Structure formats: C-alpha cells, structure tokens
C-alpha cells in the first residue's frame, strides 16, 4: 500500500513554513522537506497520529537546500537524506544522478530546476492518485524540462496546501 499524508501545509509571507509530507511505500517511510515550522510539534504530532516514530523514518527527501525546507532534518536520526545530487547517511556522502532515482518502488525523483538549480520533485504513484511534491516557484531562466503538473493528479507545493490538477 502506498499512501501520502500531509503533515503540515506550508505558507509564505510575513512568516514562512514548508509543506511537510509523509510517504508510506513498501518498507519506506519518507518525509519530504522537514523545514521551518512554528513548533516542532507541528511535525511530530501528525507523525505520531499516523503511528510513526521519528526514528522509524527511512528517508528524508529535500526538494532543495534552503533552510525553510531543511531545518528539522535532525528530527529523523536514522533516515538517509536524499536530494537530487546525492544521498547522505551519518558521515557518508554518496553522489548519484537523481533524475529518475527511486526512493521506493513507487516514488521517483525528477530534476525540476526553477526556484534553485538543484530543485527536485518527488513523484509518488499512491493508491489513490499520482502526487507531485514540488516547489512551484520557477525563474524564467530555469524552466524545468519536465512539467510535474502534467504528471500529477495532486500537487503538494513547497508552500501551500495540496491541489488537484485538472486534466
């Protein structure tokens, strides 16, 4: 069973907080963009409500390296941290080509530069829909080659609540 759970709907304005997501797929528990929130309990309580301890999280996926998306990585001490360029675990840094890299059987990274050159999108084929966790702030000179909106039924942007893509 593959499921996607919004733990925290992000926002941007006078304050900033990232959208934080849990993906369950096979043996993988993936947290997406554990960034800035007003209180860490806004991440930990929804996780506990799903029966997930922070120590059980297997992967943390970072869409890019800005603090508003990364500041709470340490909440997940056993997780492998994955971005578009590499995987990080303890003191290991393993370079990889992230385009098409699979974190789990039904989740895949896509290079989608826009907000930053290393922006990546996590596309998940869940049981109920295809989800894209992506930043959605593109600069004109960094338009991605692939459109995560075209592939998804539901988009969870880096800052904001999920929305359905009309096709």
Predicted regions located by residue number:
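Conserved beta-strand hairpin/beta-sheet module of binuclear metal-dependent hydrolase folds
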Residues: 1-49, 120-136
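Short active-site oxyanion
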Residues: 29-30, 56-59, 153
